[in-house]
Amino acid sequence: MTNSNRIKLTWISFLSYALTGALVIVTGMVMGNIADYFNLPVSSMSNTFTFLNAGILISIFLNAWLMEIVPLKTQLRFGFLLMVLAVAGLMFSHSLALFSAAMFILGVVSGITMSIGTFLITQMYEGRQRGSRLLFTDSFFSMAGMIFPMIAAFLLARSIEWYWVYACIGLVYVAIFILTFGCEFPALGKHAPKTDAPVEKEKWGIGVLFLSIAALCYILGQLGFISWVPEYAKGLGMSLNDAGTLVSNFWMSYMVGMWAFSFILRFFDLQRILTVLAGLAAILMYVFNTGTPAHMAWSILALGFFSSAIYTTIITLGSQQTKVPSPKLVNFVLTCGTIGTMLTFVVTGPIVEHSGPQAALLTANGLYAVVFVMCFLLGFVSRHRQHNTLTSH
């Protein structure tokens, strides 16, 4: 593989995470405006965003098999066509059914692109370098989570319709589409070059189960937490602007943490540092949930920084449970994380309705504690050390 080709594929991976980050995180910013647009209460509007998460979940799950049937370049180019259709649907339809369908399509495109992006990184890089590359890739999710809410706020403050926010997000996919030209992708399945070596049946092991539970609980905990921080902060007497700043600070700190840990992780055993970070994140979230408004800004900055490497390290360790990185295994762990995304409002909505936003934040805290337990148990069964030793010889 040429260096310029590797750079193009790496940038496709970066932008695939930026696309998903923008779509998922911008939801909270535009939900109120979309509810007004359709004359619906915000609570029932949040349910329609489940279509976005369902699209992401289904496409990541199915793409574990589709990658071996449909070439990656074809998938990305077809995704561009779907993206144009979905954004056009949002702009020109006033029907809630069409809005839900467009959200589902956006989810499908996002899920396919993100699973391809993750696979490309696990395919091109090995060992600890894979972990730091995946972490840097994931930082684009946070970067988009910081940039696109600012773009949304800029547009909405000037009474520009909410669907232009999605048109701006579509520009990320335009960049991905342009990068596919003159770029060679790894061939998989029936398109892969034939070898005489027999294909070894891979055994995943119980470590994959622990990592999958950790992925689900981490994403559900993180999004359950960050989705209700503004409501919780407003309940404590903070202004909407200050509450929004808390969320922006979290993602900014998260992004800085990813850049820092993409360097730091090279010097540590991944399972051990993951356990330490998961424990720290659970403690810092508890400090935020039980602290005073004066300390909230500092505790959310610390939480963002120390939790930034958790999800990517879970995926990296998942890919290292077999000798050869398996798209099915990586996609399985990703799917579990996406189930967490999909369950965000399903789980936290009723909790907030009955017990208020703080109860949702404490539930998220409990989920982070589960992540810590799973990471600790992984230490007894993980195969990443033996596979790293094999690849280094």
Swiss-Prot record:
What does UniProt give as GO cellular component? plasma membrane
Keyword terms: Cell inner membrane, Cell membrane, Membrane, Transmembrane, Transmembrane helix
User: PROSITE patterns in the record, alphabetically?
Assistant: MFS
Localization per record = Cell inner membrane
What Gene Ontology terms describe what this protein does at the molecular function level? transmembrane transporter activity
**Does the keyword field hold Cell membrane?**
yes
Similarity section: Belongs to the major facilitator superfamily. TsgA family.
NCBIfam families membership: PRK03699.1
Q: What protein name is recorded for this chain?
A: Protein TsgA
Which species does this protein come from? Escherichia coli O17:K52:H18 (strain UMN026 / ExPEC)
Gene that this polypeptide is encoded by = tsgA
